[in-house]
From Swiss-Prot:
A motif (COPII vesicle coat-binding) lies at residues 211-212. It comes from Homo sapiens (Human). It is a single-pass type I membrane protein. Glycans are attached at N103. Residues 35-187 are lumenal. N-linked glycosylated in complex form containing terminal sialic acid. This is Transmembrane emp24 domain-containing protein 7. Residues 209-224 are cytoplasmic. Disulfide bonds: none annotated. Predominantly monomeric and to lesser extent homodimeric in endoplasmic reticulum, endoplasmic reticulum-Golgi intermediate compartment and cis-Golgi network. Oligomerizes with other members of the EMP24/GP25L family such as TMED2, TMED9 and TMED10. Interacts (via C-terminus) with COPG1; the interaction involves dimeric TMED7. Potential role in vesicular protein trafficking, mainly in the early secretory pathway. Appears to play a role in the biosynthesis of secreted cargo including processing and post-translational modifications. The chain crosses the membrane at residues 188-208.
């Protein structure tokens, strides 16, 4: 016969390990209502994306230019009837939240048509609707168990960690791009200075040589 209290201890251990296992499963990405894409936008180009959204759905569009030029891009969002919901010119990053007023296909475009020479790398995150509940009982009046409440808290914390990591990666990529661009400019400037110094040195050598060169004088006899 098991000793008194052993069942409670085993239940507590099982609960802790079950919560840990569920936390590990939450780390695996699953289906959701968000689309994250990083794409190349050439110069004089425009790229559009389309999303079917139901009426009353809350959506958020967030974008950031990672590399290229002045790190800016034009963004435009339209509803199914072509009405402009959001429009910004030459923005480095921004976020816009709206609620779909009707069913249909919504379009959002990124434009680099104002740039003639530089292409851009653009990241955007388009979130449609709310995440589904972790447990079916979340939508009911009944209270969650202690394990379910802990797992929900872990799930929310993990989502915050993922958001922070995404923003940190974007900042790191943008900072690396700026550093590489600055390094290239410094290298070109150093090569230019070296060439100028070489030309000046050669000019000085020829100038000094002309000062010490022998000048032959010619004499003319005048006959009487």
């Amino acid at each position: 016969m098991p000793r008194p209290g052993s069942a409670q201890r085993w239940a507590a251990v099982a609960g802790r390990w079950g919560c840990r296992l569920l936390a590990l499963l939450l780390l695996v990405p699953g289906p959701g209502g968000a689309s994250e894409i990083t794409f190349e936008l050439p110069d004089n180009a425009k790229q559009c994306f389309y999303e079917d959204i139901a009426q009353g759905t809350k959506c958020t569009l967030e974008f950031q230019v990672i590399t290229g030029g002045h790190y800016d891009v034009d963004c435009r969002l339209e509803d199914p009837d072509g009405k402009v919901l959001y429009k910004e010119m030459k923005k480095q990053y921004d976020s816009f939240t709206f609620t779909a007023s009707k069913n249909g296909t919504y379009k959002f475009c990124f434009s680099n048509e104002f740039s003639t020479f530089t292409h851009k790398t653009v990241y955007f995150d388009f979130q449609v609707g709310e995440d589904p509940p972790l447990f079916p009982s979340e939508n009911r009046v009944s209270a969650l168990t202690q394990m379910e409440s802990a797992c929900v808290s872990i799930h929310e914390a993990l989502k915050s960690v993922i958001d922070y990591q995404t923003h940190f990666r974007l900042r790191e990529a943008q900072g690396r791009s700026r550093a590489e661009d600055l390094n290239t400019r410094v290298a070109y400037w150093s090569v230019g200075e070296a060439l100028i110094l070489l030309v000046v040195s050669i000019g000085q050598v020829f100038l000094l040589k002309s000062f010490f060169s022998d000048k032959r004088t010619t004499t003319t006899r005048v006959g009487s």
